[in-house]
Amino acid sequence: MNVAVQSRVDRETIGVARKTKAYVALTKPRVIELLLVTTAPVMILAQGGWPNPWLILGVLVGGTLSAGSANAFNCYIDRDIDRVMKRTQRRPLVTGELTDREALVFAWIIGVASIVWLGVISNWLAAALSLAAILFYVFVYTLWLKRRTPQNIVWGGAAGCMPVLIGWAAVTGDISWAPVILFMIVFLWTPPHYWPLSMKYRDDYASVNVPMLAVVRGRAAVGLQTILYAWATLACSLLLIPVAGMGLVYTLAALAGGGWFVYETHRLYDLAVRHEPIKPMRVFHASISYLSLLFLAVGIDPLLPF
């Protein structure tokens, strides 16, 4: 093979690899990881033991495609503000690694594929819930709430709670009080998880007129709201104990993890009211660790003999 041909092949290979990486980035894989953390444990709880491993794998694949579709639509819709905000400068529609058309077609393809896949691999209730999650995230949160109200993440966060319902429905074919409580745990957890991040990137959101709570209210007000939602999350997590018959492992995780999460929110608020330097990302990272610990306990508890 001559040098010119080899060079062209190398460029094409690099181009394909970079394009593939851009498509993956469009789905926001780090967000998807957190969503999947809640899915598999709920399936174990719904089964009261290990479900069929192929069902778990199939639902996780479907959930990945579904969340990826919603995130890709979000990137397409928000491409105008992503070009202005510093923290989104490396997204593929900003860098030009993907065209607008490529992103939109990709979002549609994996979205439709996720619905069909979940319907075939599990049941059509799970598929319908997945469709509802995509539609809610795209139309209610991204197109309606995000740029209009500081409560955007409160109500828009409902889309991120859907994986627990999807996981439960995939196993049982219905919805009961236990998954509703799990839904509410994630719903109440979302604001104190996301608001600290918006405090760090307050200037970014202000530059594009997105009315995040950190933009329209002071640090102390945001800190107080974070405390209230963290306490509500802890209280809601304890409701699962009598409703789903959770055992010692879950109870300890809910109390210890929830207590730590609440402590970090109080610490953030105390620094804010004293006008001292704050570290909102401590709460952000603590919230991720807390939710992961809690749902790990959700999955472990049904497998134990006590």
UniProtKB/Swiss-Prot annotation:
<feature type="transmembrane region" description="Helical">
    <location>
        <begin position="218"/>
        <end position="235"/>
    </location>
</feature>
<feature type="transmembrane region" description="Helical">
    <location>
        <begin position="286"/>
        <end position="306"/>
    </location>
</feature>
<comment type="pathway">
    <text>Porphyrin-containing compound metabolism; heme O biosynthesis; heme O from protoheme: step 1/1.</text>
</comment>
<dbReference type="GO" id="GO:0008495">
    <property type="term" value="F:protoheme IX farnesyltransferase activity"/>
</dbReference>
<dbReference type="InterPro" id="IPR030470">
    <property type="entry name" value="UbiA_prenylTrfase_CS"/>
</dbReference>
<keyword id="KW-0350">Heme biosynthesis</keyword>
<comment type="similarity">
    <text>Belongs to the UbiA prenyltransferase family. Protoheme IX farnesyltransferase subfamily.</text>
</comment>
<keyword id="KW-1133">Transmembrane helix</keyword>
<dbReference type="GO" id="GO:0048034">
    <property type="term" value="P:heme O biosynthetic process"/>
</dbReference>
<feature type="transmembrane region" description="Helical">
    <location>
        <begin position="168"/>
        <end position="188"/>
    </location>
</feature>
<dbReference type="Pfam" id="PF01040">
    <property type="entry name" value="UbiA"/>
</dbReference>
<keyword id="KW-1003">Cell membrane</keyword>
<feature type="transmembrane region" description="Helical">
    <location>
        <begin position="31"/>
        <end position="50"/>
    </location>
</feature>
<feature type="transmembrane region" description="Helical">
    <location>
        <begin position="238"/>
        <end position="258"/>
    </location>
</feature>
<keyword id="KW-0808">Transferase</keyword>
<feature type="transmembrane region" description="Helical">
    <location>
        <begin position="104"/>
        <end position="124"/>
    </location>
</feature>
<protein>
    <recommendedName>
        <fullName>Protoheme IX farnesyltransferase</fullName>
        <ecNumber>2.5.1.141</ecNumber>
    </recommendedName>
</protein>
<feature type="transmembrane region" description="Helical">
    <location>
        <begin position="125"/>
        <end position="145"/>
    </location>
</feature>
<feature type="transmembrane region" description="Helical">
    <location>
        <begin position="55"/>
        <end position="77"/>
    </location>
</feature>
<keyword id="KW-0812">Transmembrane</keyword>
<dbReference type="InterPro" id="IPR044878">
    <property type="entry name" value="UbiA_sf"/>
</dbReference>
<keyword id="KW-0472">Membrane</keyword>
<dbReference type="InterPro" id="IPR006369">
    <property type="entry name" value="Protohaem_IX_farnesylTrfase"/>
</dbReference>
<comment type="function">
    <text>Converts heme B (protoheme IX) to heme O by substitution of the vinyl group on carbon 2 of heme B porphyrin ring with a hydroxyethyl farnesyl side group.</text>
</comment>
<dbReference type="InterPro" id="IPR000537">
    <property type="entry name" value="UbiA_prenyltransferase"/>
</dbReference>
<dbReference type="GO" id="GO:0005886">
    <property type="term" value="C:plasma membrane"/>
</dbReference>
